[in-house]
Amino acid sequence: MSIRPLHDRVIVKRKKVESKSAGGIVLTGSAAEKSTRGEVIAVGNGRILENGEVRPLDVKVGDQVIFSEGYGVKTEKIDGEEVLILSESDILAIVE
């Protein structure tokens, strides 16, 4: 199944968090929280402005991003994999 986000929505596959610290300690509970980094796997056409124009998104497929786990972030399972559906405004940075 493929997924195509609408407007300014972005589909992100969350990066897995290491379950061990650099010193070899196994992390559990709050120390092993979910990552706020991921890879963009699909983008919408862009934000619709008040004048009706469409502003293309700044992110593109393949970008590594840091995102906020805000109110509008939705988690879905697509083909057995968990993905996040979020607005471009929930993306804080592109990792270069």
From Swiss-Prot:
GO cellular component terms, A-Z: cytoplasm
CDD domains xrefs: cpn10
Pfam family, one: Cpn10
GO biological process terms on file: chaperone cofactor-dependent protein refolding
Localisation per UniProt entry: Cytoplasm
InterPro entries: Chaperonin_GroES (IPR020818), Chaperonin_GroES_sf (IPR037124), Chaprnonin_Cpn10_CS (IPR018369), GroES-like_sf (IPR011032)
SUPFAM superfamilies per the UniProt record, alphabetical: GroES-like
Primary localization: cytoplasm
Kinase listed as a keyword: no
Keywords associated with the record: Chaperone, Cytoplasm
Keyword Chaperone in annotation: yes
Subunit composition and interactions: Heptamer of 7 subunits arranged in a ring. Interacts with the chaperonin GroEL.
Family indicated by similarity: Belongs to the GroES chaperonin family.
General function of this protein: Together with the chaperonin GroEL, plays an essential role in assisting protein folding. The GroEL-GroES system forms a nano-cage that allows encapsulation of the non-native substrate proteins and provides a physical environment optimized to promote and accelerate protein folding. GroES binds to the apical surface of the GroEL ring, thereby capping the opening of the GroEL channel.
UniProt name for this protein: Co-chaperonin GroES
Source organism: Colwellia psychrerythraea (strain 34H / ATCC BAA-681) (Vibrio psychroerythus)
